[in-house]
Regions:
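Extended catalytic cores of very large enzyme megasubunits
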Residues: 1-148
């Protein structure tokens, strides 16, 4: 395995976008990033020889997994693997669609949505504005903001 990427540009993109920072050690090398991906995503889903071949192919830039999975493999993806996806889709046909979209966006994943008549006709009408003294307390987390 090689710690070097072929060009300065590739090295910059790796260090600035995908390499985790480790206190006292600095940023990961390309090897470290691929190993983190392998340990956390590939795991033991394939036999050791296939796992080694996959690692070598990624290391040599012959194949590339989702860059979001390279970036988030580890603790972030263990908490919620939504962060590993580049994009998602949902039909806006229920009020919970808005909660789901907010949560997915807060995880860093894009959300495409449908507002076709057959979907949005299932939503309740929005009431007229009215004065209220109600205070809403929002838990400062992805889940809290999505439910607010």
């Amino acid at each position: 395995m090689s710690n070097q990427l072929p060009t300065d540009y590739q090295a910059f993109i790796h260090k600035s976008r995908y390499a985790k920072y480790h206190e006292g050690q600095g940023r990961e090398s390309w090897d470290d990033t691929v190993t983190r991906f392998s340990v956390n995503v590939i795991r033991d889903m394939v036999d050791p020889e296939t796992k080694y071949q996959l690692e070598q192919a990624i290391m040599g830039l012959e194949v590339m997994p989702s860059m979001r999975s390279l970036m988030t493999a580890g603790a972030a993806a263990e908490r919620d693997n939504t962060c590993m996806y580049n994009c998602s889709y949902l039909a806006v046909d229920d009020l919970k669609s808005f909660d789901e979209a907010m949560f997915i966006l807060l995880c860093g994943t894009g959300v495409g949505f449908s507002v076709e008549r057959q979907s949005i006709s299932k939503l309740p009408e929005v009431p007229e504005l009215f004065q209220s003294e109600t205070n809403i307390v929002v838990k400062d987390s992805k889940e809290g903001w999505a439910k607010a």
